[in-house]
Amino acid sequence: MRKIVYILFALLGVGGGLQSCDNGETYAEQREKERDAISAFLNRDVVIRLSDGEELIHVGKINTISEGEFYAQDSTTNLERNEYVVFENTGVYMQIVRKGAGEKMKNGQQKRIICRYTEFNILRDSVQTTNNSAYWQTNPDIMDVTDTYGTFTASFNTSVNGGGRMYQYYGSKAVPAGWLVPLTYINIGRQINADEEIAKVRLIVPHSQGHSDASSNVYPCFYEITYQEMRN
């Protein structure tokens, strides 16, 4: 059965609310609950809709592939089969919707990247934050990213626009580690021609690769994110 989640977007975006795990559960129990939630999410046909019924994201039932299968098919995920590759060392699941215009980052490069995203708290079964609303269109989240021999480090920029939704909501410049996983495989550029599009991915990020609130409260999130190089 298709699972439909309706969302009411407020003027300043949507916040699902920070959750507390101070309920007597051990860390091991919280991790088990997280694993169960991810497993259930993979097998549900989730559709996230706006309050007016317009479809925002159709996640669908997910087919996972191994890293070996992912690399064997030129680091792509088959969209018709709704494939997500699971990275065993981090537990992050990734679907590359579009590899995007431009080129992959190179060693020593620094880039300022605009990110537009929706964050879905899998454990709470609700959208927690998004900057895909009218208010945040002119104030997107901006990452300052450095590539050092294939290892990416990043922080949210606050000097350009005072910080986007992620920074304003969580109060931290730290970029979730899960957000950096796609940078090895996607291009970072800008749309120049009509037939070009910027990079877009979908992620399932466990608490260990998430922001500080996810880490401290042990919950996984689903993300849909676009990555676009900012003009100098």
Where are these regions (language model features)?
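Cross-family detector of peptidyl-prolyl cis-trans isomerase
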Residues: 21-232
